[in-house]
Amino acid sequence: MGLLVTLIGDMVGSRDLPDRAGVQRRLAAVLDEVTGLLDPAQRLETTVGDEFQGAFDDVGTATLAALMVRLALLPEVDVRCGLGEGEVVVHDPTSTPLLQDGPGWWAARAALEELARPRRSAARTWFEGPDPGAAARVNAFLLARDALVDRLGERGLRLLAASLRGSTQADIAAAEGISRSAVSQQFSRGVGAVRDAQALLSPPRGDGEDDT
């Protein structure tokens, strides 16, 4: 399939979840939803165990997908996503999940394995690519972005998820049943920073970016 950004993710601490079957069904539904929103080169789908994968045409959309999946599952379940840029070879396009490998796929696998190292225990997204300098810049963004997400409460997580889907602050206030002022306060505490930083890497969706 040529040069892609492959995403390979897994659930954090999945063996300790009380309802693993229910969580797997929820993950599958979230992956279908994000696939519909972002139109990836390869749809997001579960693979084996607690893992899932997909592929995108650019790193910005891949980082957005990782964040959208994470936000849809938090706070009950957390995920880690390894992203790898490079050529992907699909050996059997009829299989589900796709039977594939190649430098891009292995780079994503290496990125996920990096997240399993003790020094990355707090990180949730990592990128490996052919240009070390570019990869370092992407990872600097991802480390800061995911740390900000970790500081958000449940409402902040919902507001950020809605904003990334294109909802304006007025839309969000109506959906949450709270005032515009309360929404604005949440945006000033990190929601807006994450949304705006993400928009620099991936195209904004809807009108949410215009309503500050």
Question: Model segments located where?
Answer:
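Regulatory and interdomain segments flanking nucleotide-handling catalytic cores
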Residues: 1-212
